[in-house]
Amino acid sequence: MAVVAIAFVFFLSAMVLSVHAAVVEHTFIVSQVNMTHLCKETPVIVVNGQLPGPAIEVTEGDSVVVHVINKSPYNMTIHWHGVKQQLNCWADGVPMVTQLPILPNHNFTYQFVVSEQEGTLWWHAHVPLYRATVHGVLIIRARQGVPLFPKPHKEVPIIIGEWWGIQLAYADTTSDYNSASTINGKLGDLYNCSGAMEEGYMMDVEPGKTYLLRIVNAALLSEYYLKIAGHKFTVVAADANYVSPYTTDIIAIAPGQTVDALVVANAAPGRYYMVAMPNQPPKPDFQSPVLPTRGIMQYSNTEGRSLSSDVPMSPEMPDNHDTMVSFYFHGNLTSLHPRHLLVPERLDERMFITLGLGSVCKHDRLSCKRGDGSNESTILATMNNVSFHLPPVSTSLLEAYYNNPSNVDWLQELPDMPPQVFDFTDHSLIPTGPKAERLEPTSKAALARRFRYGDVVEVVFQSTSLMQSDSNPMHLHGHDMFVLAQGQGNYDMEKDVARYNLVNPPVVNTVLVPRLGWVAVRFVADNPGIWYMHCHYEFHLTMGMVALFIVEHGPTVNTSLPSRLLDLIGTANDHFLMHGQKNGIERTLGCAVI
């Protein structure tokens, strides 16, 4: 323990001595509180008693120290979404992959440096479903250099989320949905309790001033369209990477993504609705409730009259089934990066990954009807027709790997291609029909893919009808990805490679794979460790749409993962974060299936 303490003191001393850098320290107390919405009191897990949780604000190069005190009845970890954690995979916050979970009545300290990143990221729980209420914004400001857009009058975090009127520990992934959508934790006046409207988010503005909206989609289930009546956005960054300024009246943002957008208060003084509406594929895809929310952008009183009685102007929203709005929004983004990142031209690894749903037989049955949601089978989410399943382990995979890379040789390799090539976007497979039953049966495994340090990796994600035509926001921990191209239908290497943007593609940590379409990304495996790659739709994640990307140590000390400074206080035999399997849906808890 003395060695750990000395190491920690040395770590802090080194941070303080860094030129101009600061140590930003927070304490997160995770607890269960009761909140009342829609005439119902619900137990909710939150940080420091608030929803959303506290904002973390840093300057590029600063060090962050967060003490997590878990007073909730559930195990917990915190993931710093989009923070690259260079040479610091230990702080990534994935239970049983990078650390043991933080047990109730136990503590853990995260420490990391935010380097070579600027913009908006966020933090959230990385245990199933609880990121719905355990989340907050992480703001990174530039330390030096010429600003790439005018300095705003004010910065405003806008966190789009969901309100669940049930205890998330008991959510049924086949039939339970959120009760409302939220902006900064508020449901808004589209919802009421016995006729009394729910409180909505209010954004006060001054005429002529410019505001920087730091937008986060913290929702579990849906991509959202965001509009403000009578105003336009100028998008300047996505996932903490600058983009060429893009003017639009609507923002499409998928779960896990962040967008920085400027808004000028240049309309007539008054009140204007800010609407966040979830989108979803049209029928025959399964239809979930459409639950938009709205806040109000209100001009300050400049003429001596009250504006509170003004009827807010409403924006004209697209059809919630019009997913092409999202396709065009993401397709219009190009990078504008001060560090002049170059897209690597050489390729060391190329993968084609299909995203779908499948099923396995229950109770060790040798055969059952594929796609059957009855008691015969369990529905899974898959990558190349394999669903992630990690058996019980006694320590984190990262610790086992660090001690000896051969300790994780039992992990099954994620294949380069699906086991069977077919018309991936065949509409007759929505929902799973007779054709799907003739495809390769789904399997379960602890999926991983190893990369040498410095490998350039290209991945094409292909959406399939077996996903019931859902889009999929795919998030890679520890790395950013160049988004080279996206398209509708099936990917065709001979034709589609010619469409790649190798000059100024957007750079993201979470890329949306369009419904019944594909997206091609490229990244450099230059951060040693074991990194999660997964869908950020929560139910797809818990059902197994996960793989581990293992980046091997480089040839030098500066390209190899160092040892961790602090051990997690907890017991390895209590690594299951929740208990139960409901209605044929199997839930993968980050790394353990129960």
PLM regions: where:
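Conserved small-residue hotspots that stabilize compact domain segments
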Residues: 207, 229-236, 243-246, 250-304, ...
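Extracytoplasmic/periplasmic copper-protein system
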Residues: 18-20, 134-160, 286-319, 544-594
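Extended recognition/assembly regions associated with phosphoester-bond processing machinery
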Residues: 261-264, 449, 459, 516, ...
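Eukaryotic intrinsically disordered, low-complexity regulatory regions
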Residues: 177-190, 204-210, 216, 305-366, ...
